[in-house]
Amino acid sequence: AVRAGDPTEVDLNPTFDLFQQDELNAMKKLNYDLLDKYWKTAVTQQHSVNLSGATEQASYFANIAYFTQDGNLGKLDYERWNFRAGVDLKITKSLKASLQVSGDYGKKNALLLKVQNTSSERDYMMLLSHPQYIPEQVGGKYIAAYGISNSELNATQCYNYELLQNTSDYTRNMTQNTYINAALDYNFGWSRILKGLNLRLAYSKAISTTKSNEMGTSFNLYKLVERTGSGQHLYTPVGDEAYYNEVILADSNFAQAHGGAISNGTDGGYINRQMTRSDNYQLNFTANYARDFGKHSVSALFSIEKTESEYENVYALGVNPYEFSNGQSNSLNSQIAGDATTSSSFGRSESGTLSYVGRVNYSYDDKYLLEFLIRSDASTKFAPENYWGYFPSVSGGWGVSKENWFAD
């Protein structure tokens, strides 16, 4: 009524641009609340087993856990395994060893919902904003959510959730991580000469792998050429049901929406795979010495650290899969675009660092302090002629408050 009375609405057709009274009355009985239809309670499960123990010479622990969860909407499930184990050994009075191993494996399966390259995270918003007078199917055919104009104003109107739930399209992600930490410690406390010297050798390694697969196909939606109601805005019977069954549901009254096939992702459908792997380790050797000789205190440290890392990734894309495709690489329809149906890329990188650290500290009666420090670092991130950098330093201190005359 407001628009009809607005003199600036010169192109307004009150019959077809506005809902009519018979349509408004019919809509009171319509409630295609898709969010309520598809929303479900998500179930989460978590199970774990723990083991631990100790003797005079060793202590140990182990844990394995399993977690699974499904989603509130659609086909979604996630599962993850975690494990941890460790042992500490007292090999001799002076020698100790430790080892810890941990890791996880996760897998997520979900329905691909990238209609016309929209975000796959928009399913909630699409269901929430779906007009509640528009059904998902009419006469056994999936319908585009065209509103009052019966035309496509936005690609999101091609989002038919029921159809998507019945496709084989998917997105799958897998992650796998393994971590190892080991160490040896030796104490020279038994030696009169080397007392105060401690050696430590530590090693850590991390391996991570990810893999993601996606498959999207194309599908067809329909629109009604002639709709129901005096303004032709509805999809359900208004008045004469015989007319609805004979005319509205006739095959000739259905036209393809969007002007052609609708893609779930890339035009024509696609198969996408990506894999990454990273492998790195760190090795440390440290020698610490600290000892007092009367009023003289001496401490020293020497350390070597070496790291190496490697990373690689592979990406592949294939378009125009067959309708019966199950995501395998041999299920592309090469008759459509020939050799242009596939593309791939890959990358690989390596890096490493090496560091030496030396430090000597001397203190007399906690009054006079002296420190010598030198550090040398090398990194493959720099040009070969600039691999190494050297950083020496000398510092001294005077504890004035320790002087006898200061207290007086």
Task: Locate the predicted segments by residue.
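Residues embedded in well-ordered regular secondary structure
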Residues: 1-75, 112-115, 344
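Extracytoplasmic loops and strand-loop junctions of Gram-negative outer membrane beta-barrel proteins
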Residues: 30-35, 67-70, 160-169, 264-272, ...
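Extracellular low-complexity Ser/Thr/Asn/Gly-rich intrinsically disordered segments
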Residues: 4-8, 15, 192, 266-268, ...
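Short acidic-aromatic active-site loops that bind/stabilize oxyanions
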Residues: 36-41, 167-174, 270-277, 343-351, ...
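Surface-exposed loop/turn segments flanking beta-strands in extracellular/periplasmic regions
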Residues: 7-28, 118-158, 218-263, 310-343
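Transmembrane beta-barrel strand/turn architecture of Gram-negative outer membrane proteins
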Residues: 1, 55-141, 169-225, 229, ...
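Signature of Gram-negative outer-membrane beta-barrel scaffolds
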Residues: 209, 329-393
